[in-house]
């Protein structure tokens, strides 16, 4: 009984991991296709740049030095821009 339960749980875990990995691979392959517009990625980059610049400008107006904003997703604020770390 225990062996059967362990086998079922193991198979379920492998299936979930395989499905997740397959979805990630499919998403990466779609992003890497030649000729596919990168408008969605460009929009995200522009949004991060805008958020960071606005944050720094607000801090400067308050007579404070511009502190690094915590940009999300592996990005970091430098020179009023979010740059990839």
Swiss-Prot record:
| Maturation propeptide residues | 23-48
The answer to keyword Cytoplasm applying to this record is: no
| Signal peptide range | 1-22
> Which compartments does it reside in?
Secreted
The free-text tissue note of the record is: Expressed by the venom gland.
Picking any one GO molecular function of the record gives:
toxin activity
User: Which coarse location class describes where this protein primarily resides?
Assistant: secreted
Any Gene Ontology CC annotation: host cell postsynaptic membrane
Q: Does Transferase appear among the keywords?
A: no
Disulfide bonding pattern of the chain? 52-66, 56-77, 71-82
**The protein's role, per its UniProt record:** Postsynaptic neurotoxin.
Q: What family does this belong to?
A: Belongs to the neurotoxin 12 (Hwtx-2) family. 02 (Hwtx-2) subfamily.
Name of the protein in its database record: U4-theraphotoxin-Hhn1i
């Amino acid at each position: 009984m225990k062996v059967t339960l362990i086998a079922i749980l193991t198979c379920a875990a492998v299936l979930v991991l395989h499905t997740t990995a397959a979805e990630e691979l499919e998403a990466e392959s779609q992003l890497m296709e030649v000729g596919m517009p990168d408008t969605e990625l460009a929009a995200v980059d522009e949004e991060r740049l805008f958020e960071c610049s606005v944050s720094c400008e607000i801090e400067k107006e308050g007579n404070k030095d511009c502190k690094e904003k915590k940009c999300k997703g592996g990005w970091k604020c430098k020179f009023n821009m979010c740059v990839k770390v």
